[in-house]
Amino acid sequence: PVGETTLGRISNVLGEPVDNPGPVQSNTIFPIHRSAPAFTQLDTKLSIFETGIKVADLLAPYRRGGKIGLFGGAGVGKTVLITELINNIAKAHGGVSVSGGVGERTREGNDLYMEMKESKVINEQNISESKVALVYGQMNEPPGARMRVGSTASTMAEYFRDVNKQDVLLFIDNILRFVQAGSEVSALLGRMPPAVGYQPTLGTEMGSLQERITSTKEGSTTSIQAVYVPADDLTDPAPATTSAHLDATTVLSRGLAAKGIYPAVDPLDSTSTMSQPWIVGEEHYETAQGVKQTLQRYKELQDIIAILGLDELSEEDRLTVARARKIERFPSQPFFVAEVFTGSPGKYVSLPETIKGFQMILPGELDSLPEQAFYLVGNVDEATAKAAALQVEGQ
């Protein structure tokens, strides 16, 4: 079953509801195995998709109607980040969303459902006004179900795109579990695994799922996918195969998570095909490049600092380090979905505000502020206010 009746409901791989409000009344049924749209039907317009998350918007901007991957090892914040994106985008974005839980924890699926009910993305009183359809094939399901649940979610999204001609958001958590399920099925079929024990058909399976997630002239599908990175190794076949299909990659770093900088997005590892001056504009591009250059220089100097100490650096390098430490902290921001844990209200920072903030740090306009003032704030005005508060406390 596809269509408006699936909104606000949780379905399994077969499209059967697994929540309480009874059967899904839908006259339209689509098969989950469908071919990708023809090349001539694809839409090639390039525009930026604002998320309200500073580090993503500035350094690896997302493409409207593109595919975005959130890469990270265990426990660095992929699910929190994808939940925050669902929260920011599903609320601000007028269209509908489809969220596919592929082989992840049932608890996370339940948390997401409860959160959506609280934020009224799922309207319990009038279920037809909900903005999201949930499709779950979690860890406890057999491998066949986990392998196919991504296709079920794609099919639901395709209905909204092709029949209703809407802009759709498709969230998938987690692509690696789809690959693992394929590997289990492959072993059961007696296929010989190549290196690392993945299935020999890995590229084909990934392609058949990813090629369907695209934007046509009828409507767009913007897809955000969490990708678990086994043992923090980005060259593992599963994340490596996935990244070939993506427009933007947001890489989460264990080092930043250990420093307490959340979202722990690595500014030097994250990439985007949209980071071009003719797409994002000169101002945005120059600022992003400046930020990356400063952080790269800081990274090069870290060995010298570790061995000889800060005092051995030249005046210019010391200034670079001071600014880089501010730039490293400024991308951290409080999340709406983490309010219950942190106690600080979430922040949505618009792209112009983000650019303005980094433009003030780079040339040294904010050299007088302590680096703690840039930690877990929204825009640059909040950092200035926090610095003033810290000064009062110090006195």
Curated annotation (Swiss-Prot):
The UniProt record lists the keyword Secreted: no
Chain residues that bind ATP: 72-79
Highest rank taxon of the organism: Eukaryota
PANTHER family, alphabetized: ATP SYNTHASE (PTHR15184), ATP SYNTHASE SUBUNIT BETA, MITOCHONDRIAL (PTHR15184:SF71)
Top EC class, one word: translocase
InterPro entries per the UniProt record, alphabetical: AAA+_ATPase, ATP-synt_VA_C, ATP_synth_F1_bsu, ATPase_a/bsu_AS, ATPase_alpha/beta_chains, ATPase_F1/V1/A1_a/bsu_nucl-bd, ATPase_F1/V1_b/a_C, P-loop_NTPase
Family stated for the protein in its record: Belongs to the ATPase alpha/beta chains family.
Entry keyword Chloroplast: yes
Chemical reaction(s) catalysed: ATP + H2O + 4 H(+)(in) = ADP + phosphate + 5 H(+)(out)
Species assigned in the record: Microlepia platyphylla
Entries under NCBIfam families matching the protein: atpD
Main location: plastid
Protein name: ATP synthase subunit beta, chloroplastic
Keyword entries, A-Z: ATP synthesis, ATP-binding, CF(1), Chloroplast, Hydrogen ion transport, Ion transport, Membrane, Nucleotide-binding, Plastid, Thylakoid, Translocase, Transport
